[in-house]
């Protein structure tokens, strides 16, 4: 029997401990070899730049930072060390750069002469081998490219025929249509000669078909070019954008010697400071200003002006890149203030702008709105006094005033709007104190703006080209009175009365926009929505679809007052005020979306009985000066401010079934969407709380708590629940009935069997002329 071998556990334990110590020492040595340990003074610390909007840092100045190191804290205290890898240590040490700013050479320990011989020209054998291999690779690439070209040439069709040799200096394929366009674009711009504009701008104006300046342009452009601060007031659609856009571009052309764009060396030498800042109250107006100025610049030869638009709803990082080298900045106040706060050093550049333009100033400077405007104005007007300036002065010299220490930049302030008086911003509803004074008083408007803005001149030039009326001359204003529940019916009737007319419908709430858009779409009308709760891309998409030349000429845009200012869309013939505007200036800007320039347009108010007080105050504020004007304006006195629009009651009665069905369908769809969103919110809240949620049980308890529709909002909730209770089959039946009604023409008392017996023009029907919505003769609106 063999003897059993005994194991010594103590020896194995000792060997394992020794092995772990050896491995730890090896790892430590390898870690120390791969990293360098340095002290605090050896690192090249970088100064932390503080944000521009940080006024009071509470002592946190002179902060420095370093990246790419680890902190080593001694166990027994002592100096803190920093560890970094050898690949990164070269870039963070103080001596890693020489005096010239170039990286220092990598000094290595001398290890003697190598085995490789060196030629007389200092090229090693290893370098020669690398060059030889590189040449072989290039030869292979050349052969590959040649073979690919041969293959592509072989793939060409054989019946192409022999190639025609052409001169490299002559471009082929240019059609004569381009020459024809050049001839057609020639417009007589001799009317602009009195403004002394450059040849580049006159060429651009000719290509844009602007043959003569408008009154506001003729009055403002010379004053701005002379360096004056200007306050311009003109009716909507009078060309106020070019009144300040042309002088800004003219200044740019004069700065670069007649339109020459800055060279690359000039761009490197310059700090890329913006030249002009244009503030806009809405995103749509900002993008429209960008479009107009871009068209002006693109049609001017040899002119390269960089324009950046900063609005909400778009990428803030992209806007930061655009601001870095922008010449003209067009922005809404909120997003601009946000971007300025996230950038370093940009506020100091913004203080050096040459032009500050405030478009729609009455809205931007109104009390309680756009707080960021005041912050932006205070920031660019703030004067900083550096410590170096005080250090250079002797102690005997008195402290200088801020104006003496750093003189303000020669910035021009340009203010434009169609309404300036604060009385127009008072609410039309409710109890207000009515003052029977001149609502367009020049003195009050000047004092109001002088308190808000820091003009360079003591008294800026106030230019008012239409002191009597703020409305466009070719605008017709009408009024439709209706019952409280018939607004939808009269709106639909007005739209049918104006076929092939682009119509803009204004409401006072977002919920009304959503409901009317759904209602008109159910009535088979091309309708788009626009309100502030929409995403920015959706807003731009709605405006693009509504204003596109390829879209339906009967397109309808239902919008809140976000579209009331500055929106310049060609072809808008009708403005319908579904709700009476809250203020008189809003009515002016709403109606200004039509009858722009020399075109004509209509503006119609739909007035319910409870809105008559607001309409009376509106007429008193807007049209009061017409009665008090001089005898030379006798023609305007004969014109009734708001003409009554008489609609045919037969047509209204025949359209009522359509609108009733459309309202039922719309209310059902919106109620289902609302209940679904509320149910989703309650379900997610129940999951967060960890409780069970039953929608039917919750609805039953809620109805019991409300007391069967009693209390505030109880009746509305009961109607919504009833509308949402419609099944899919019932909803589909209502839609089928509505489609059948909409597919037919509205008969106004004509026999469909004997068309020739009445007043129907059969030839016009066959040609598609007249109003396709009606069957029979319909009188046009009298106003």
Curated annotation (Swiss-Prot):
Return the SMART domains for the record: DEXDc, HELICc
Question: Which Pfam families does UniProt cross-reference here?
Answer: DEAD, Helicase_C
Where does the record place it?
Nucleus, Nucleolus
Q: Where is the Helicase ATP-binding domain?
A: 221-438
Q: Where is this motif: DEAD box?
A: 359-362
Domain comment? The Q motif is unique to and characteristic of the DEAD box family of RNA helicases and controls ATP binding and hydrolysis.
Tell me the segments the record calls region Disordered. Answer: 1-32, 94-168, 388-410, 696-719
The record ties this protein, via PANTHER family, to:
ATP-DEPENDENT RNA HELICASE DBPA (PTHR47959:SF1), ATP-DEPENDENT RNA HELICASE RHLE-RELATED (PTHR47959)
Q: Which GO terms describe its biological process?
A: rRNA processing
Please note every region of biased composition (Basic and acidic residues).
Answer: 126-168
* Catalytic reactions on record: ATP + H2O = ADP + phosphate + H(+)
Gene symbol here is MAK5
* Keyword annotations: ATP-binding, Helicase, Hydrolase, Nucleotide-binding, Nucleus, Ribosome biogenesis, RNA-binding, rRNA processing
Using the record, list the residue span of the signal peptide; answer none if the entry has no such feature: none
* GO cellular component terms, A-Z: cytosol; nucleolus
Q: Where is the composition biased (Acidic residues)?
A: 105-121
Renumbered to this chain, the Basic residues biased-composition regions fall at: 1-22
Outline the extent of the Helicase C-terminal domain. 490-648
Task: Write down what this protein is called.
Answer: ATP-dependent RNA helicase MAK5
Which GO MF terms does the UniProt record name?
A: ATP binding; ATP hydrolysis activity; RNA binding; RNA helicase activity
Q: Where is this motif: Q motif?
A: 190-218
Residue pairs linked by disulfide bridges in the UniProt entry: none
Positions binding ATP in this chain are 234-241
PROSITE patterns listed in its UniProt record: DEAD_ATP_HELICASE, HELICASE_ATP_BIND_1, HELICASE_CTER, Q_MOTIF
Gene3D superfamilies from the UniProt entry: P-loop containing nucleotide triphosphate hydrolases
Q: Which family does it belong to?
A: Belongs to the DEAD box helicase family. DDX24/MAK5 subfamily.
